């Protein structure tokens, strides 16, 4: 069967699980030590900071999916349920300097924490979709209802920390906003918010190629009134005689200060990470290669929360989220007993070239297992990226 020709009159059941962890700085060995609970050595902290970039990015995306679909020659309808955990950050090198050493190594110097963020989001999504096929075109959309479970968001617009030579003056000039949902739970359907999402796709077919544009998960969650919102700015600590260097992370120091925080009881909106894709799928002239694909992925993800939905600006989702435009290629090779799909990608949250593969067993009923980061098997604890993909498809 032509790889670009869809089946008709089929009812499919899809089950999938997709886990991706990507970083441009954090290795698995370092991650294990950071969360092991053991005391970090000075040597570890120094080596960790010396290997950092100016911008340090990390992302975890874990999705479990169940979908039903019916398709004939004219249209396709679908119903699906997704549970998703999405965390990401983009932090300056000085942020980790501050966390590990406080201000003890920045006397007469300024630490710069500008344009940093941390975000963690968990939600469920129920989608209904419909697509219509014309002669050489296919147009589709999906409408989703969102159940917001948990949200943690901290956004640093501007932040500097200056410590004077004799440590009698500490100047913190910053603009920080944070929010978190009041009740945390890992259980399904813990409703701390509600929202909607939209998917759009457009497909154009020619004799040997298909061109596809997709917008996935454009939407937002309105969190319930029990969210805790905080903002703060501009703090000066001065006029006290100090006889020894102060570590700003010392709990006694922090407890003796009084930072003004402003609690907001207004609405809280957060947006989903929205994927925008452009894909060209071409038939292969080589007998055992079904098709070759090249694609471009972009991420629109505002890293802060909003009190009004009208406050959002398109540029908010294009910068600071740490995702670089990604290009990838994928081929489908028929080896009789299974399909072998090598994948090459560059961009995203990683600065490296990533090598992946998918293995698909079966035809109408199939099982697929794959990874976007086979290099992690060779690098093991030194790897920055880990991923695994599982899919079970049943056609009736």
Language model features by range: what are they?
Residues 4-188, 224-256, 309-317, 367-372, ...:
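A subset of solvent-exposed loop/turn segments in beta-rich extracellular surface proteins, enriched
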Residues 9-17, 75-79, 137-143, 198, ...:
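Transmembrane beta-strands of outer-membrane beta-barrel proteins
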Residues 49-53, 187, 290-317, 331-350, ...:
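Transmembrane beta-strand segments that form the barrel wall of outer-membrane beta-barrel proteins
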Residues 52-60, 116-122, 188-194, 268-274, ...:
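Short sequence motifs at beta-strands and strand-loop junctions characteristic
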Residues 63-67, 125-129, 197-201, 277-279, ...:
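Membrane-embedded beta-strand positions in outer-membrane beta-barrel channels/transporters
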Residues 384-396:
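Outer-membrane beta-barrel "beta-signal"
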